[in-house]
């Protein structure tokens, strides 16, 4: 079984190939399933497994979906072979509109990362950490907070490097969805922020995720190039989610009698 990971790197921005949410599907599936038949693919081949990310625009008819999400409305590219779980109810709605069967099993599999790693929070060195989406990383709003002692966390630092960085802060601000999801996974208080508002798909994936974990819809706090540490202290930080990890894991395709032969 080939597990799909979207490669957004290019000659100008090669490090985007390491965007955290795009590089965790393969290790998640390989570790949780214990399958020896798992392969990684960055290609839009038919018959792949879609797991983490807003990647349902890359669907083919033979694909399986376990946790993936839509980037926006009307972006489902094909009818997959079977859907086991999706990121949230907005994604499910996009599938059902097209007549595609989709169970009400929700959850971004990135929330399972603590189950396959050994990272523990001890004594954070920084009070605040900012995770800019990679389209936001060079903006004045980021530099402004960096000068005030906020730890700037690179979402493209690498699978383990990124986790180590978020372990080092008390409160997370993020314009990246997977910055928020990673924070939730390890129980780090977090808040969505907007920097440039250039994210493709707008609020869709954020709302989809909020609904999946029973969180009030959050459109984000707008950072300015004059934002102060005092302003950050007034933001409402999320600290809890409603997430049934066992239900998501039990919905996995390698546990389905019809599809387990693809994994073992």
Where are these regions (language model features)?
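Active-site anion-handling motifs in enzyme catalytic cores
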Residues: 1-264
């Amino acid at each position: 079984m080939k597990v799909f990971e979207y490669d957004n790197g290019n000659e100008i921005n090669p490090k985007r190939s390491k965007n955290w949410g795009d590089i965790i599907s393969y290790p998640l599936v390989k570790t949780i399933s214990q399958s020896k038949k798992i392969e990684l693919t960055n290609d839009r081949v038919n018959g792949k497994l879609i797991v983490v990310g807003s990647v349902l625009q890359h669907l083919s008819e033979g694909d399986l979906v376990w946790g993936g999400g839509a980037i926006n409305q009307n972006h489902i590219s094909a009818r997959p072979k079977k859907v086991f779980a999706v990121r949230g109810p907005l994604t499910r709605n996009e599938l059902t509109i097209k007549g595609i069967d989709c169970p009400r099993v929700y959850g971004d599999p990135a929330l399972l990362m603590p189950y396959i790693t050994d990272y523990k929070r001890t004594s954070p060195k920084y009070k605040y950490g900012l995770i800019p989406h990679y389209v936001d990383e060079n903006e004045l709003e980021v530099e402004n907070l960096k000068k005030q002692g906020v730890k700037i966390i690179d979402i493209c630092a690498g699978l383990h490097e990124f986790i180590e960085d978020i372990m080092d802060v008390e409160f997370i601000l993020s314009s990246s969805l997977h910055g928020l999801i990673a924070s939730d996974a390890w129980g780090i208080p977090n808040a969505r922020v907007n920097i440039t508002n250039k994210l493709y798909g707008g609020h869709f994936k954020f709302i989809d995720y909020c609904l999946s974990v029973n969180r009030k819809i959050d459109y984000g706090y707008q950072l300015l190039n004059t934002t102060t540490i005092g302003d950050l202290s007034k933001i409402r930080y999320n600290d809890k989610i409603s997430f049934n990890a066992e239900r998501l894991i039990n919905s996995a395709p390698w546990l389905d009698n019809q599809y387990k032969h693809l994994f073992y």
